[in-house]
């Protein structure tokens, strides 16, 4: 049978998706983290894979879903948090712009699955299914109450889940995970469609969202989930040693305040007393697209005058960051390859061919 007759939409999808195959899965498994360091990979949105010097693997907010895929319904879902925030009716054109760099069903070595909150782009049923089917039967699922409720609803056994709230500490091998206050005001207006937010005091944030501080033998990582800017970052900076901080950055559409701005990112880095501040989340949604270089430009304008003790780092999805080896780097580039050029004799018609 000819190829053009045997190929189907389904075979095309299976042959190309996920776009990176198991490349990153293999890279993470093969990584030997040196003493006094930790390594992490950006999985897209606020998804992070963290690996310690002891070989402990945890993932946070790993999400494998999509945004809008059709113009079919021109209206926003009734009661959506963005509708509540801005009084809009039109469909939000949030298309996923980032490739799938990690295959959840190729994960074999993992010690904990975490989520910061229950928004669809931060917790994933496919990840839960893959870990339940293919990994050790004692891998815990750690998150605030709303996340645990989701996991249990999907079929994760209750005894595999750990509910955390600010102040809680969970030890996973050589990583100490501190749950801290979250500052995600959008989470507070994420309500059932028939429930009104106007004139009603919101319920507590602690059941809905947390930030995390991962303390490893080689350094610490602060994951802020979808938090907006808050003065309380300074409190966290006073109470903890923070080496690297991750913040949700984006270009907010008119009438919307859902992501931190470049100025907010610098304020967060300063307040946390971090050594490195890294933006994320700006990669994922087409309508929140932002230029992270803006953070670096603003940092250059202010760093000497305000005596900043941190540097920004502009990352790429699927890329690795190693603390402290990369602490003075300002921007990531994917490995370029060809480092072994001329280890064998070139096969060219003549030397000056190129």
Swiss-Prot record:
One annotated GO molecular function: manganese ion binding
Entry's EC annotation: 3.1.1.-
Induction: Induced by L-ascorbate. Repressed by UlaR.
Gene3D superfamilies per the UniProt record, alphabetical: Ribonuclease Z/Hydroxyacylglutathione hydrolase-like (3.60.15.10)
Locations listed in the record: Cytoplasm
TM helices/strands, residue ranges: none
GO BP annotations listed: L-ascorbic acid catabolic process
Cofactor dependence: a divalent metal cation
Coiled-coil residues: none
Record field: catalytic activity: L-ascorbate 6-phosphate + H2O = 3-dehydro-L-gulonate 6-phosphate
Function noted in UniProt: Probably catalyzes the hydrolysis of L-ascorbate-6-P into 3-keto-L-gulonate-6-P. Is essential for L-ascorbate utilization under anaerobic conditions.
The family this protein is said to belong to: Belongs to the UlaG family.
Protein name (record): Probable L-ascorbate-6-phosphate lactonase UlaG
Organism of origin: Shigella boydii serotype 18 (strain CDC 3083-94 / BS512)
Annotated gene: ulaG
């Amino acid at each position: 049978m000819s190829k053009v007759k045997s190929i189907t939409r389904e075979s095309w999808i299976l042959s190309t998706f996920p776009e990176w195959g198991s490349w990153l899965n293999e890279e993470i498994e093969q990584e030997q983290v040196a003493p006094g360091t930790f390594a992490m990979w950006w999985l897209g949105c606020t998804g992070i894979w963290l690996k310690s010097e002891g070989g402990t693997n945890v993932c946070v907010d790993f999400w494998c879903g999509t945004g809008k895929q059709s113009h079919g319904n021109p209206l926003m879902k009734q009661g959506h948090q963005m509708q509540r925030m801005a009084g809009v009716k039109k469909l939000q054109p949030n298309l996923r712009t980032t490739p799938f760099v990690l295959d959840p069903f190729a994960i074999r070595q993992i010690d904990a699955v975490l989520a910061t909150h229950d928004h669809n782009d931060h917790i994933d049923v496919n990840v839960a299914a893959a870990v339940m089917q293919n990994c050790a039967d004692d891998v815990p699922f750690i998150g605030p109450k709303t996340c645990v409720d989701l996991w249990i609803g999907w079929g994760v056994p209750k005894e595999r889940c750990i509910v955390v709230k600010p102040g809680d500490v969970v030890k996973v091998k050589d990583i100490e995970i501190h749950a801290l206050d979250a500052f995600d005001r959008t989470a507070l207006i994420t309500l059932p469609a028939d429930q009104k937010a106007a004139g009603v005091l919101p319920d507590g944030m602690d059941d809905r969202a947390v930030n995390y501080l991962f303390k490893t033998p080689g350094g610490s990582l602060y994951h802020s989930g979808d938090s907006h800017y808050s003065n309380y970052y300074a409190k966290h900076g006073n109470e903890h040693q923070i080496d690297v901080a991750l913040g949700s950055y984006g270009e907010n559409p008119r009438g919307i305040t859902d992501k931190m701005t470049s100025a907010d990112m610098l304020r967060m880095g300063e307040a946390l007393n971090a050594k490195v501040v890294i933006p994320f989340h700006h990669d994922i949604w087409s309508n929140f697209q932002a230029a992270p270089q803006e953070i670096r430009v603003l940092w250059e304008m202010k760093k000497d005058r305000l005596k900043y003790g941190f540097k920004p780092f502009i990352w790429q999805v699927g890329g690795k960051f190693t603390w402290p080896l990369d602490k003075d780097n300002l921007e990531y580039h994917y490995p370029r390859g060809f480092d072994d050029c001329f280890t064998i004799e070139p096969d060219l018609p003549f030397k000056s061919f190129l």
